[in-house]
Amino acid sequence: MKNLIILTGLSGAGKSTALGLLEDMGFYCIDNLPINLVETILPVISMNVDNIAFVLDARSENFERIDEILNNLKKKYASNLKVIFLTAKDAIIINRFAHTRRNHPLLKRVNSLEKAIQLEREILTKALEFSDIVIDTSNLNPHQLREKLVEILGSVKKKFLVRILSFGFKYGLPLDVDFIFDVRFFPNPFYIKDLREKSGRDEKVKEFLYNTQGVKEYIEMIKNVVDFALKRYENEGRMELSIGIGCTGGQHRSVFFAEELASIYRQRYEVLLEHRDVK
């Protein structure tokens, strides 16, 4: 195991948002792991997973053992472990619960939200003492919290994934891509007898399209759009961008363009290339 992140802190302070970001960064994430299971489960998971993150909070039974658990983990995992504590002002937490219309998890123990927040602060005292990083989210929106965590955890961030999918419009649009680029306005190799049975990966098809007016310019245009988006995706802490390239049947033009883009982005990113409709 390379990295172990423990998220703890007040309900309404953003633990779910933080856990979601860590999942985007490639962590194996567990929400509200029972505290008595931490030292049992962790060795099993760490055998096959490099990056692990889980939430420990006041909902957990036997939370009074938090100091014992964290002390043991710090001894065992040392530099691999970071404990991040999320907090916020009472008024902010009250407003967030009102906005989401959710009940505070400790409200059943007391008779008001204010008392539930105070009780949770008391329960979390030991967890706060063992924390490596404390983030006050009172003045942070979810986007800003994501940026803060990316800044803190940048050194453990996984490589950005660019997923490129070629497809044929006649077989339906892909539903899981961020951008779709249409290449149907270029000549179709399907209507050239010697190229019909080949795919966009074939050298003769590639030569035909390379020599088609506007192809190189369009590749550069797509690249400019994708580069523009990539910078902003990375700044927001997102770790994946998906591109769909479509032609009529998904055999020639879309495959060629997808292969060209994959070749470009493999120099900087992890690339997953799929040709959905190639026969």
Curated annotation (Swiss-Prot):
InterPro entries according to UniProt: P-loop_NTPase (IPR027417), RapZ-like (IPR005337), RapZ-like_N (IPR053930), RapZ_C (IPR053931)
Gene Ontology molecular function: ATP binding; GTP binding
Highest taxon of source: Bacteria
UniProt keyword terms in alphabetical order: ATP-binding, GTP-binding, Nucleotide-binding
The keyword Thylakoid is annotated on this UniProt entry: no
Annotated positions binding GTP: 57-60
Binding-site residues, ATP: 9-16
Reported function: Displays ATPase and GTPase activities.
Family: Belongs to the RapZ-like family.
Annotated HAMAP family: RapZ_like
Protein name, per record: Nucleotide-binding protein THA_1518
Organism, as annotated: Thermosipho africanus (strain TCF52B)
